[in-house]
C-alpha cells in the first residue's frame, strides 16, 4: 500500500481547501498563498513522517516575500548617485586604456550587471579588518575588478594616475587586470582567476576560520567569507565540487553570491534551460540555504494581482535564452512575446506603457531586494548560504551590450553610447566633456562623499585591503633542535620517516607547536603519520560522536574539535585549498600558521597545478611535501603514480622553492632554512616543495662544510679514491645511492676515482645561474658573478643522475664547468616492478651510470671504446632494448 493515497476520500473538504487558497490568492496574491502553504508544510508532522515531499526547485520568484522584507537602512537616493559614479568611472577606466591602442583588453559588462549587489555590500555588510574584528574575507569575481578600483578611487584610496594605468603595470603604478595579490600586495587578498578557484578556496577559507576558532587560536566567529561568482563560472568542476563539504561542516560563515546574468563569455549559460533552477536544486540538495533574488520591486504589484497564477507559471517556464533576448529588445517586444503568451498575463500589463514594461527590473538591480537577501543570509545558522541574483549582463549599456552575446568582449564605446550611459544613470558630466572620457569624483564636503566614508567607518574601514607582513611574531626553532637528525642514523630509514620525525620535533616546540598544521588527503598511514592521530588529533568541528573501531590501539583514529590535523579525505584540491588558507593566514588573519601538506608527489602539481600557481600569486608561505616521489623509488604503483616530473612543474612557479633531498640531515637543514626565510625577520613570500622517498637506506651524519651547499643546491659529498680522480658524478634523492655504488665500481673495476656530489636542488642552481647570467649581461664593466654550481664543481667530465626526467638536470648544463656533461633520467611512462628492475629499465642504475662515465671519459681520450663495449657485456646491458621514453 502506498504511504499516501491518491484517492480523494472527501471531495467536499478538498473543495473547501481549494476555495480557501483561491480566496487568499484573490485577496492577497499568489506570494501570500505560497507563504501559507509553505508554513503549513513546516508544521504538519505525522508520526515522524514527511507529509509533504520537498521540491528541490521552487517557483521562479524571490525567496523572501514582500511582507518579510526588512526596512532598507540606507539612503537609496544618495546610494544611487554614488553607484552611478562608480559605474561611470569603471567604464571610463577601460575606455581610456583602450584608447591607447595597446590591446590591453578589459571587461565592462560584468561589473555593470553586479554593481548594485556590490554597493549594497559595501554600504551595509562588508566588515573591514580592525582592532575589534578580523573582518570579512571577500573573494571578488575576477572580471569586475574595474568596479572595485572605481570605488577605491572615490574613497581616495587610488589615484587618477593609477586608474589611467589600468592593465599597465610595468612602470609600477598600474592596476592589475584581475585580483592579484602578487601585483597589488596591499590591495587584493585573493586571486579569483582562473575561474573556479574562488569558490573552492572560499569554502576551505571558511572552514579554516572555524578551525582557528575551535582550536582557540583566534576569535573568528564574527567573520564572514563572501564569494562572488558568475553563473557561467559555476560550470567549473571546482565551483561545485566541494559544496557538500561546506554543508557537512555547517559553514554558516560562508555566503556564495552568484551573479546570474544568464550569460557566459560567448553566449547563454543554459539557453535551453534555467541556470538559477539548476543551481537551486544542486545546492539545496547538498544542504545549503538557497535564497533567490529574481525580481525587483516593480514586479511586486503585478505578482500580487496574479490571481490566476499564470504570471508565475510564465516565469517558471520561460527559458534563460528568452530572458536574455527580452532585455536586449524593448518593452513592446516583452509585451508581445512574454506577457502575450497568456490572456491573463497580457491583461496584467494592459495599463502599462512599453517603457514601464521595459523598466520592470530584475532582483539583482534592486537594493531593497538585495539587502533583504543579504540580511537573511547573515542570520542563517548551521549551514552555508547561496544567493542567486538575477541580473542583466551589460546592465545600463543599452544597444552597446545590454543582454547581448557580445557583452563580454565590449571594450570600446562610441560617443553616442557614452551619452546614453551618462543619461541612463544621470552622471554629472557636461556633454562637451564626454569626448575626454572624464572621471567623476565627489567633493570632500559633498553629501555623497561624507555618506560613503561614514558607511565604511561604521563597518570598520575599507576593503579590499591586504596585510603584506604579519606583526604577530613568534620564536622559531634553532637548528640544534634537529640534532638527532644531523648525526648518522642508527638504522636504515626513508626520508618520509625523517619528515615525520621533523614534524614531531616541531610539535614539541612550545613556541610554534600550535601553529603547525599537518594536512593530508587520506594517506596518513601510507606516510607513517598515524602516530599523530592520538597525539594531536584529527580536526572535526563536532568532535567524535562515535566509538572508533581501533579505540584500544595506541594510535587510534581520534577526531577532536580541537584536533590539529586537517584530514581532507580523498580530495587533493580540497587539501591544497586548506593548505592555501593556512599558508596565507599570516596575511588574512595576522596569525601565521605553518602548514605541511603531504601527498603523493604525482598527485600534486600535475593534478592541481592551477591552485599552486594561485598560491604563488597569493604569496603563500608553507611547505608542500611530495611523498613517495621518484619514478623508480615508488616501485609498485606503476604508470599513474610514478613521478618523474613534479619538480619540472614546480619550477614554473617563480616563488616555489623546490628540493629533492637524499639524507636526513639535508631535509632537517632545508626545513629549518624554510622556517627562517618564511617566518623569520625577512618574511620572504615563498613556499617550499620538498620531495621525500619511501626507500630505506643508511643516513650518514652532516659535516660542517655542507650547510651552505644544502640550501643553495649542491655540495661535495665525498671523494671515492684518493688518487686518479677523473670524473664528477651528481646524484639527487634516492638515486644518490646508485651514484655512490657506481663510484665504488669505477674505482674497483677501472681504477677511476670520482667526486660525488649531492644535488638537493637543480632548480635553485639553475635559477642562481640565470641570475648571474643576467647580472653579467647588464653590468659588463663590473666583476662577473659566478654561479654557485660553477664554483663548487671543476672541469672534469660530469654525470648527473636523477629519478626525474632528463630535463630536470639539463637545466644546469650552461653552468657546469665540466669539459663534458651527460644527464641520465627517467623519461617515459612508469612501470610496476622492483626498484632494481625499474632502475635498470630506465637506465639509471649503478651499471648504466658506470657506462655513462666511461662514455664521457672516452670523449676526452681517457678510455678506449673497447672498454665501453666490454663493460656493456660485463654488466649485461641490453643495447637493443627499446628506449624507455618510447616504450
Curated annotation (Swiss-Prot):
It is an enzyme of class 1 (oxidoreductase). InterPro entries: PDC_E1_N, PDH/Transketolase, PDH_E1, PDH_E1_M, THDP-binding, Transketo_C/PFOR_II, Transketolase-like_C_2, Transketolase_N. The gene is aceE. GO terms for molecular function: pyruvate dehydrogenase (acetyl-transferring) activity. It catalyses: N(6)-[(R)-lipoyl]-L-lysyl-[protein] + pyruvate + H(+) = N(6)-[(R)-S(8)-acetyldihydrolipoyl]-L-lysyl-[protein] + CO2. Keywords: Oxidoreductase, Pyruvate, Thiamine pyrophosphate. The keyword Signal does not apply. It comes from Buchnera aphidicola subsp. Baizongia pistaciae (strain Bp). This is Pyruvate dehydrogenase E1 component. Component of the pyruvate dehydrogenase (PDH) complex, that catalyzes the overall conversion of pyruvate to acetyl-CoA and CO(2).
Amino acid at each position: 500500500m502506498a504511504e499516501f493515497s491518491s484517492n480523494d476520500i472527501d471531495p467536499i473538504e478538498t473543495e473547501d481547501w481549494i476555495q480557501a487558497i483561491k480566496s487568499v490568492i484573490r485577496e492577497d496574491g499568489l506570494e501570500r498563498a505560497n507563504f501559507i502553504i509553505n508554513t503549513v508544510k513546516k508544521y504538519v508532522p505525522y508520526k515522524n513522517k514527511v507529509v509533504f515531499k520537498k521540491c528541490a526547485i521552487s517557483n521562479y520568484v524571490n525567496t523572501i516575500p514582500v511582507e518579510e522584507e526588512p526596512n532598507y537602512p540606507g539612503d537609496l537616493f544618495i546610494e544611487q548617485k554614488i553607484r552611478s559614479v562608480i559605474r561611470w568611472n569603471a567604464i571610463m577606466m577601460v575606455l581610456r586604456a583602450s584608447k591607447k591602442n595597446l590591446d590591453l583588453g578589459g571587461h565592462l559588462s560584468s561589473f555593470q550587471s553586479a554593481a548594485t549587489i556590490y554597493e549594497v555590500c559595501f554600504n551595509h555588510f562588508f566588515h573591514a579588518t580592525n582592532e575589534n574584528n578580523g573582518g570579512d574575507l571577500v573573494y571578488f569575481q575576477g572580471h569586475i575588478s574595474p568596479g572595485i578600483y572605481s570605488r577605491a578611487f572615490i574613497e581616495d584610496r587610488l589615484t587618477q594616475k593609477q586608474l589611467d594605468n589600468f592593465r599597465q603595470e610595468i612602470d609600477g603604478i598600474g592596476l592589475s587586470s584581475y585580483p592579484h595579490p602578487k601585483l597589488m600586495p596591499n590591495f587584493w587578498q585573493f586571486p579569483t582567476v582562473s575561474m573556479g578557484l574562488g569558490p573552492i578556496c572560499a569554502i576551505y577559507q571558511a572552514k579554516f576560520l572555524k578551525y582557528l576558532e575551535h582550536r582557540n587560536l583566534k576569535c573568528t566567529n564574527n567573520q564572514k567569507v563572501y564569494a562572488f561568482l558568475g553563473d557561467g563560472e559555476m560550470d567549473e568542476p571546482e565551483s561545485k565540487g566541494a559544496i557538500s563539504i561546506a554543508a557537512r561542516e555547517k559553514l554558516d560563515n560562508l555566503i556564495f553570491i552568484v551573479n546570474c546574468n544568464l550569460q557566459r563569455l560567448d553566449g547563454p549559460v543554459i539557453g535551453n534551460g534555467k541556470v538559477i533552477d539548476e543551481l537551486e536544486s544542486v545546492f539545496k540538495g547538498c544542504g545549503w540555504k538557497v535564497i533567490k533574488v529574481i525580481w525587483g520591486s516593480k514586479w511586486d504589484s503585478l505578482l500580487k494581482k496574479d490571481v490566476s497564477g499564470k504570471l508565475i507559471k510564465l516565469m517558471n517556464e520561460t527559458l534563460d535564452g528568452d530572458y536574455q533576448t527580452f532585455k536586449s529588445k524593448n518593452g513592446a517586444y516583452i509585451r508581445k512575446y512574454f506577457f502575450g503568451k497568456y490572456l491573463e498575463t497580457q491583461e496584467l500589463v494592459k495599463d502599462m506603457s512599453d517603457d514601464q514594461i521595459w523598466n520592470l527590473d530584475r532582483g539583482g538591480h534592486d537594493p531593497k531586494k538585495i539587502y533583504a537577501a543579504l540580511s537573511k543570509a547573515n542570520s542563517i545558522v548551521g549551514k552555508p548560504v547561496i544567493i542567486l541574483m538575477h541580473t542583466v549582463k551589460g546592465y545600463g549599456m543599452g544597444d552597446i551590450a545590454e543582454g547581448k552575446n557580445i557583452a563580454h568582449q565590449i571594450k570600446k564605446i562610441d560617443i553616442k553610447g557614452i551619452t546614453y550611459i551618462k543619461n541612463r544613470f544621470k552622471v554629472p558630466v557636461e556633454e562637451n566633456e564626454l569626448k575626454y572620457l572624464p572621471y567623476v569624483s565627489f567633493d570632500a564636503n559633498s553629501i555623497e562623499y561624507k555618506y560613503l566614508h561614514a558607511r565604511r567607518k561604521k563597518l570598520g574601514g575599507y576593503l579590499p585591503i591586504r596585510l603584506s607582513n604579519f606583526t604577530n611574531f613568534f620564536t622559531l626553532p634553532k637548528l640544534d633542535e634537529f640534532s638527532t637528525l644531523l648525526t648518522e642514523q642508527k638504522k636504515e630509514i626513508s626520508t618520509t620517516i625523517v619528515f615525520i620525525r621533523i614534524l614531531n620535533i616541531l610539535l614539541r616546540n612550545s613556541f610554534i607547536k600550535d601553529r603547525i598544521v599537518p594536512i593530508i588527503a587520506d594517506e596518513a598511514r601510507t606516510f607513517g603519520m598515524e602516530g599523530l592521530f592520538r597525539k594531536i588529533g584529527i580536526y572535526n568541528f563536532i568532535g567524535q560522536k562515535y566509538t572508533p573501531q581501533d579505540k584500544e590501539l595506541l594510535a587510534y583514529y581520534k577526531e577532536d574539535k580541537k584536533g590539529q590535523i586537517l584530514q581532507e579525505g580523498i580530495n587533493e584540491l580540497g587539501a591544497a585549498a586548506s593548505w592555501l588558507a593556512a599558508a596565507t593566514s599570516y596575511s588574512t588573519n595576522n596569525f601565521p600558521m605553518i602548514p605541511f601538506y603531504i601527498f603523493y608527489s604525482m598527485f600534486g602539481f600535475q593534478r592541481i597545478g592551477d591552485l599552486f600557481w594561485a598560491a604563488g600569486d597569493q604569496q603563500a608561505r608553507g611547505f608542500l611535501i611530495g611523498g613517495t616521489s621518484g619514478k623508480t623509488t615508488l616501485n609498485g604503483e606503476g604508470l599513474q603514480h610514478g613521478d618523474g616530473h613534479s619538480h619540472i612543474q614546480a619550477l614554473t612557479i617563480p616563488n616555489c622553492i623546490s628540493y629533492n633531498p637524499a639524507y636526513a640531515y639535508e631535509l632537517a637543514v632545508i626545513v629549518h632554512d624554510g622556517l627562517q626565510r618564511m617566518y623569520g625577520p625577512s618574511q620572504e613570500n615563498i613556499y617550499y616543495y620538498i620531495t621525500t622517498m619511501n626507500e630505506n637506506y643508511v643516513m650518514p651524519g652532516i659535516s660542517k662544510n655542507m650547510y651552505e651547499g644544502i640550501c643553495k643546491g649542491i655540495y661535495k659529498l665525498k671523494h671515492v679514491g684518493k688518487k686518479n680522480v677523473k670524473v664528477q658524478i651528481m646524484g639527487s634523492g634516492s638515486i644518490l645511492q646508485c651514484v655512490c655504488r657506481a663510484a665504488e665500481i669505477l674505482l674497483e673495476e677501472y681504477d677511476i676515482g670520482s667526486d660525488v656530489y649531492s644535488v638537493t636542488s637543480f632548480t635553485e642552481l639553475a635559477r642562481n645561474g640565470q641570475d648571474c647570467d643576467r647580472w653579467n649581461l647588464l653590468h659588463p664593466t663590473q666583476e662577473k658573478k659566478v654561479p654557485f654550481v660553477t664554483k663548487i664543481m671543476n672541469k672534469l667530465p660530469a654525470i648527473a643522475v636523477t629519478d626525474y626526467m632528463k630535463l630536470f638536470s639539463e637545466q644546469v648544463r650552461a653552468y657546469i664547468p665540466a669539459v663534458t656533461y651527460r644527464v641520465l633520467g627517467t623519461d617515459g611512462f612508469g612501470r610496476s616492478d622492483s626498484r632494481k628492475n625499474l632502475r635498470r629499465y630506465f637506465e639509471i642504475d649503478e651499471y648504466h651510470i658506470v657506462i655513462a662515465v666511461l662514455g664521457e671519459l672516452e670523449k676526452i681520450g681517457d678510455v678506449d671504446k673497447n672498454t665501453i663495449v666490454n663493460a656493456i657485456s660485463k654488466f649485461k646491458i641490453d643495447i637493443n632494448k627499446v628506449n624507455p621514453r618510447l616504450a
